[in-house]
């Protein structure tokens, strides 16, 4: 199970989320990215006004057809572009703990550091580590309030899909396949112990107990943003980690240089660096080998032929193949 903090744009929307124990994401690629990243059984808090609000468990996910006028949130139309954003992607939540705590607390240091290094709320959500979840589970008090019932007309749901063909794009039901979606699929793939064990074996890191590791999404550093960070969930004496950079296209020499900077910044406790891409030139492979960076090609199956696929189908088709 993972823990996410979800950014909320204004006080009114936060109150609606709290009143109905509901989270909603817009009909945009960032909205669908967040919806795909968060799974049933994960934990979330709302992020607004530099504070973390409450702790919830995700009970159900649904994508709603024709949700433009569906409560509780108002749709927004931007004058310059004429684009209207509404909230078809939704999470039904169960309340666990009630609190409103500043991110300057030590308990939220992992998330606060990401916010500071990114320069603010430029993302829809932030994944926190298990240490943050353990701390959040002890804040405030147990939720005892009854949630309000949301009265909505009968609606239909759909399963969103991704495609590499521009001709089949039809938001919010079919979106272009972007790098952030590949990153999310790989992170969830490596969150499964069997997959992670095979991956660690291939990169020559077999001293770590896969049952004590966690795979996290984007982690901000002074030198950039790590796409996927594998680290010990509860470090004891050592805080060992593995950094992964993900590219949908051809790997470049700049990607190797970026990973090398991450290795230098993280120091001796960074046990490995990995570059995952669609393809590699011989020159990039040689440079990676010289710097001790492992290289993998990803394979995705049906989506490569232009067929729209669901996020779960994407994960099922995903293969990581080591190349040298």
Where in this protein do the model-derived segments appear?
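Charged, terminal alpha-helix-loop-beta segments
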Residues: 2-20, 39, 94-99, 112-324
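Short alpha-helix capping/helix-loop boundary micro-motifs
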Residues: 24-34
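Short coil-to-beta transition motif at edge beta-strands of beta-rich domains
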Residues: 34-47
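Short, charged beta-turn/beta-strand-edge "cap" motif at the junction between a beta-strand
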Residues: 47-53
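Core residues of folded domains in eukaryotic genome-function proteins
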Residues: 54, 89, 240-242
């Amino acid at each position: 199970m993972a823990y996410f903090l979800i950014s909320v744009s204004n006080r009114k929307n936060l109150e609606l989320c709290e009143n109905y124990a509901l989270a909603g994401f817009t009909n945009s690629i960032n909205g669908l990215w967040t919806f795909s990243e968060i799974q049933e059984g994960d934990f979330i808090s709302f992020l607004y006004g530099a504070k973390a609000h409450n702790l919830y468990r995700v009970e159900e996910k649904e994508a709603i057809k024709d949700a433009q006028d569906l409560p509780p949130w108002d749709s927004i139309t931007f004058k310059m572009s004429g684009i209207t954003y509404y909230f078809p992607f939704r999470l039904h939540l169960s309340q666990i703990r009630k609190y409103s705590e500043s991110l300057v607390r030590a308990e939220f240091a992992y998330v606060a550091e990401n916010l500071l290094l990114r320069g603010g709320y430029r993302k829809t959500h932030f994944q926190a580590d298990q240490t943050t979840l353990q701390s959040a589970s002890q804040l405030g008090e147990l939720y005892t309030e009854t949630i309000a019932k949301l009265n909505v007309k009968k609606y239909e749901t759909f399963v969103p899909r991704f495609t590499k063909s521009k001709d089949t794009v039809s938001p919010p039901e079919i979106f272009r396949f972007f790098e952030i979606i590949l990153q999310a699929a790989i992170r969830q793939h490596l969150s499964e112990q069997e997959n992670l064990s095979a991956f660690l074996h291939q990169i020559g890191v077999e001293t770590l107990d896969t049952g004590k590791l966690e795979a996290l999404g984007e982690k901000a550093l002074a030198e950039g943003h790590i796409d996927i960070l594998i680290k010990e969930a509860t470090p004891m004496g050592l805080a060992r980690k593995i950094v992964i950079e993900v590219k949908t296209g051809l790997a470049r020499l700049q990607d190797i240089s970026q990973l090398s900077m991450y290795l230098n910044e993280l120091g001796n406790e960074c046990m490995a660096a990995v570059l995952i891409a669609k393809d590699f030139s011989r020159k990039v492979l040689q440079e990676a080998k010289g710097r001790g960076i492992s290289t993998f090609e990803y394979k995705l199956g049906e989506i490569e032929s232009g067929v729209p696929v669901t996020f779960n189908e994407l994960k099922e088709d995903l293969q990581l193949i080591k190349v040298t």
